[in-house]
Amino acid sequence: MTEKKNRREKKNPREAKITFEGLVMEALPNGMFRVRLENDTIILGYISGKIRSSSIRILMGDRVKIEVSRYDSSKGRIIYRLPHKDSKRTEDSKDTEDLKDTKDSKG
């Protein structure tokens, strides 16, 4: 039993990608964004399919994780939106806790 000589090896497609964190500088049409990476380079980022299908909003000023190909470092795919430190959601939860405390003290 001879093996084929021209047989392709299975490669992990994620090996050719580098992940960075960046800041969204500008929103462009069709789910495209200008993103400034940690090393101060500005690249064009597009939304990944999972983010698009789950309707996650990405706005200017958001911090994101972006995958950049080694072969074309001018474009990247936004794979994750990082949570804000001073998010409105955390403020809302603090407000509801304060309301619960005031109700408990009154009743």
Swiss-Prot record:
Transmembrane domains' residue ranges: none
Ranges of Basic and acidic residues composition bias in the record: 83-107
A GO MF term: translation initiation factor activity
Keyword Protein biosynthesis: yes
Domain of life: Eukaryota
GO cellular component, one term: cytosol
PROSITE patterns: S1_IF1_TYPE (PS50832)
Domain S1-like per the UniProt entry, residue ranges: 8-83
Listed Pfam families: eIF-1a (PF01176)
Role: One of the essential components for the initiation of protein synthesis. Stabilizes the binding of IF-2 and IF-3 on the 30S subunit to which N-formylmethionyl-tRNA(fMet) subsequently binds. Helps modulate mRNA selection, yielding the 30S pre-initiation complex (PIC). Upon addition of the 50S ribosomal subunit IF-1, IF-2 and IF-3 are released leaving the mature 70S translation initiation complex.
PANTHER family with a match to the protein in the record: TRANSLATION INITIATION FACTOR IF-1, CHLOROPLASTIC (PTHR33370:SF1)
Protein name, as recorded: Translation initiation factor IF-1, chloroplastic
Organism: Oryza sativa subsp. indica
Lineage: Eukaryota, Viridiplantae, Streptophyta, Embryophyta, Tracheophyta
